[in-house]
UniProtKB/Swiss-Prot annotation:
This protein's GO CC annotations: cytosol
Primary role: Pyridoxal kinase involved in the salvage pathway of pyridoxal 5'-phosphate (PLP). Catalyzes the phosphorylation of pyridoxal to PLP.
Binding site for ATP: 114, 151, 184, 211-214
Encoding gene (name): pdxY
EC number: 2.7.1.35
Keyword field: ATP-binding, Kinase, Magnesium, Nucleotide-binding, Transferase
Protein name: Pyridoxal kinase PdxY
Example of a GO MF term: pyridoxal kinase activity
Disulphide bond pairs: none
Matching NCBIfam families: PRK05756.1, pyridox_kin
Family: Belongs to the pyridoxine kinase family. PdxY subfamily.
GO biological process: pyridoxal 5'-phosphate salvage
Catalytic activity: pyridoxal + ATP = pyridoxal 5'-phosphate + ADP + H(+)
Subunit composition and interactions: Homodimer.
């Protein structure tokens, strides 16, 4: 019987709704991953409601919790680390120490960094020190980096004028160390207004994926967290880059279709769970010239 992969997911959590680990853990489990959730913040709900309660995990608790896992002899069984929303740069540095420790215990372990830098207009606030940490430190350690367009622009200190520019910008990040860059949401001049586009760039390959853009009165939160978790999970169960990319695009769209059909603001993960594991749809990733 094949071994079930184990993944340490270090990101935010909400008690109500779906963002951070609350958006990613259950879908990753439905893919067949044993997920170890470690919550960098625990809030009552996501911040786009405009009000919330909760607290940030003290940075020293991150290595302390990992010490506990090591103490029972399980650290070497960790196959991957996923990091997302950070409450502070100190948390980020603690995570990089954990990644180094896990890679020492299991040299084949992967690290995917979802570099959440915030979007004040949408109510997502991230301290400037966190953005600096992601730009200057985390990108050099990550095996996979999964920015959205705003985060890609920040990494490259420029904005694209075309899809070709987006490819060039993502490719420039490979020089910092990652194996591949997944741009979870593209936005550039000339992009079709009725499509949602994603980009995956590796050393000698690039793929572009388009799917229909679904309309919502208020855009659901947690879609990027869901995408990052699904992409890493599919790599862990044996997909190559292109198949993991296509699966991610399809499964996320299935969740959004269910969410739209229900008229929900929060992602309908439970109702869509079978379609997450086995998407009915497929969106072909088009190979791009490098």
């Amino acid at each position: 019987m094949p071994r079930t992969p184990h993944l340490l997911a270090i990101q935010s959590h909400v008690v109500f709704g779906h963002a951070g680990n609350a958006a990613a853990v259950f879908p990753m489990q439905r893919i067949g991953i044993n997920v170890w959730p470690l919550n960098t913040v625990q809030f009552s709900n996501h911040t786009q409601y405009g009000r919330w309660t909760g607290q940030v995990l003290p940075p020293e608790q991150i290595p302390a919790l990992v010490d506990g896992i090591a103490g029972i002899g399980e650290l070497g069984n960790c196959d991957a680390v996923l990091s997302g929303y950070l409450g502070s740069a100190a948390q980020g540095r603690a995570i990089l120490d954990v990644v180094a420790r896990i890679k020492q215990a299991n040299p084949r372990a992967l690290y995917l960094c979802d570099p959440v830098m915030g979007h004040p207009e949408k109510g997502c606030i991230v301290a400037p020190e966190v953005s600096d940490f992601l730009l200057e430190e985390a990108a050099a350690v990550a095996d996979y980096l999964c920015p959205n367009q705003l985060e890609l622009d920040s990494f490259c200190d420029r904005q694209p004028n075309s899809l070709a520019d987006c490819v060039e910008m993502a490719r420039s990040l490979l020089a910092r160390g990652p194996r591949a860059i997944l741009v979870k949401h593209l936005n550039y001049p000339g992009k079709a207004g009725d499509t949602f586009e994603m980009l995956l760039v590796a050393a000698d390959q690039a793929w572009h994926l388009q799917r229909p853009l679904l309309a919502f009165p208020r855009q659901p939160v947690g879609v990027g967290d869901l995408a990052s978790g699904l992409f890493l999970s599919r790599l862990l169960v044996g997909d190559d880059l292109r198949n993991a990319f296509e699966f991610t695009g399809a499964a996320v769209h299935e969740v959004l279709l269910e969410t739209q059909a229900c008229g929900s603001y929060e992602l309908e993960l439970v109702r869509a769970q079978d379609r997450i594991a086995h998407p009915r749809l497929k969106f072909e990733a088009r190979s791009l010239a490098m």
